[in-house]
Amino acid sequence: MEIRRRPPNPKVRVAHLEYAVPHDEEEPKNILEKIVWAKDREVDAARERVPLQTLKRQIEDLPPTRDFLAALREAPVQPAVIAEVKKASPSKGVIREDFDPVAIAEAYAAGGARCLSVLTDKTFFQGGFDVLVEVRQAVDLPLLCKEFVLSPYQLFQARAAGADAVLLIAAILTDQDLQYLKKAAAALGLDVLVEVHDAAELERVLNLGGFPLIGINNRDLTSFETDLSTTEQLMERFGDRLQDQGSLLVSESGLFDRSDLDRVKAAGADAVLVGEALMRQQDVQSALTNLIHG
């Protein structure tokens, strides 16, 4: 899958005035590309509002991060559950009208989640780093910043907001990007969940090596359709290599009940990331407990 990047409009300075030069009109070819183009502009604007040095100063006084990977490895019930705090998505619109991230996070913690995932994209998922801050203040579980990371700046945003781990999506990053961002995340004490969707992406990640936490997204981010056989097919082909590298495998998206969890567990998944199935339930805590224990 090739996702084109479209950095913010270049700027030209004439005398003391600065102008943005518009790109030629062109449309993104799928939802993921649309998100990436918007994210490039968003990050550029964020840098101007909050300089990197400001984020660095905020991070200096923070306590150490929690061990996201260890929390999954040490789960008493397998597969371990990463429960997602998610208000909306591009494909489903608003998933939960009465969205209270603190109440949801507390219910997840009480219901047996090992870690939480928090959507920080505002434009397409109605999330935000402010939501991550709220959740961090409410619970002690390790937190994943679920973001479309394109720049090291976003890693500093995640750490400053209280994240313990970050998502890196192979489809939108080059091999060089993945390696550099992994090192930058480690320097900040952040675990990395690198996400793949197809054989080519998983092959890339395994060839790079050094990713102890790998996610297989059952959702095709170009169409947002889900298929649990994605995990099964990729694990059948690459399961031995994942085991040889000691990587923990997370199956993401399209998981709605215990039978789905058992299905991906049988394929080799060590953990699952579940969002919509829980967010649509009135009693989130009971729904999660039932999902974990059947």
UniProtKB/Swiss-Prot annotation:
Its EC number is 4.1.1.48. InterPro entries: Aldolase_TIM, Indole-3-glycerol_P_synth, Indole-3-glycerol_P_synth_dom, Indole-3-GlycerolPSynthase_CS, RibuloseP-bd_barrel. It catalyses: 1-(2-carboxyphenylamino)-1-deoxy-D-ribulose 5-phosphate + H(+) = (1S,2R)-1-C-(indol-3-yl)glycerol 3-phosphate + CO2 + H2O. PROSITE patterns: IGPS. It comes from the Bacteria. Keywords: Amino-acid biosynthesis, Aromatic amino acid biosynthesis, Decarboxylase, Lyase, Tryptophan biosynthesis. Pathway: Amino-acid biosynthesis; L-tryptophan biosynthesis; L-tryptophan from chorismate: step 4/5. The keyword Amino-acid biosynthesis applies. The keyword Lyase applies. One of its GO terms (molecular function) is phosphoribosylanthranilate isomerase activity. Pfam families: IGPS (PF00218). Coiled coil: none annotated. It is an enzyme of class 4 (lyase). One of its GO terms (biological process) is L-tryptophan biosynthetic process. NCBIfam families: PRK00278.1-4 (NF001372), PRK00278.2-4 (NF001377). Belongs to the TrpC family. This is Indole-3-glycerol phosphate synthase. The gene is trpC.
